[in-house]
Amino acid sequence: MSEPTSRRPAYARLLDRAVRILAVRDHSEQELRRKLSAPVMGKNGPEEIDATADDYERVIAWCHEHHYLDDERFVMRFIASRSRKGYGPARIRQELNQKGISRESTEKAMRECEIDWSEMAREQAVRKYGEPLPSNFSEKVKVQRFLLYRGYLMDNIQQIWRNFAD
């Protein structure tokens, strides 16, 4: 039988928790640090893990070493996931920034992802407003506002009507 969690060393408990978190989905390093430092719900309510900063660093290093934690992989999967849900590049960049991903890593991944953002914007507009897309000014403004909210760039949005006019 396993020993009670309170008797296990803090490093072992942190490592176990990190592996459990990363088994569900990829996380950025900053997300993992935040989740590891948050209190754990135990049988008697929230419990703190009495770990040192060195314990956290060792756990993060172990996760990198064993390929459980990889920010590049996380960024690529995050971009793919959010674009499938219909979000544009501006929104995805902002969300990655909130998750602690550097601007350089985000820009590199956005260049490598090979997503046609103009076509994605068109698909979202058609899904919301139907085919053919509105051509009068007030309806176009509604479509633009919707796509800007979804995180598409104005160039991508204007491309819809340029291609439509051809």
Swiss-Prot record:
GO terms for cellular component: cytoplasm. Its main location: cytoplasm. It holds the Pfam family RecX_HTH1. Keywords: Cytoplasm. It is found in: Cytoplasm. GO terms for biological process: regulation of DNA repair. InterPro entries: RecX_HTH_1st, RecX_HTH_2nd, RecX_HTH_3rd, Regulatory_RecX, WH-like_DNA-bd_sf. NCBIfam families: PRK00117.1-1. Modulates RecA activity. Belongs to the RecX family. This is Regulatory protein RecX.
